[in-house]
Amino acid sequence: IARFGGDPTLKRQDIRNMVATLKKAGVQRIEGNVLIDTSVFASHDKAPGWPWNDLTQCFSAPPAAAIVDRNCFSVSLYSAQKPGDVAFIRVASYYPVTMFSQVRTLARGSSEAQYCELDVVPGDLNRYTLTGCLPQRSEPLPLAFAIQDGASYAGAILKAELAQAGIT
């Protein structure tokens, strides 16, 4: 059981160091499931009055017992080469999230561009769908989002670090 206490300064490197300590102690295998204990926080994760369109922004990550790297992740959105095609998203492999793009690429200088907006729809288990449109551009658009399920995120990071250390 991995108990998380809501420490907002916890980083992936801290989890890696913890796993290295297990490895040094001779742990090679964990019998059963790795459980993430977030019971220290048993209340609502959103306050009354929070603007709904801020909930996916990094500064608005839900309060959680399991926080790793501020429960924030970054992606790059690339416009398609051809107007009308779907833009694509690159997510670093070390982020245990899934992103889907429904973003339509507009021609550079398109009159629609002034009305073009992006929106993100969070789903279960840290799955996100990016919608809207993006004018063609030569450089990717950097974006950052708040993790919505801290326990799932922390658990996936812990499992990845255990696997990397050879602990099965």
Where do the model's predicted regions map?
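Conserved serine DD-peptidase/penicillin-binding transpeptidase domain
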Residues: I1-T168
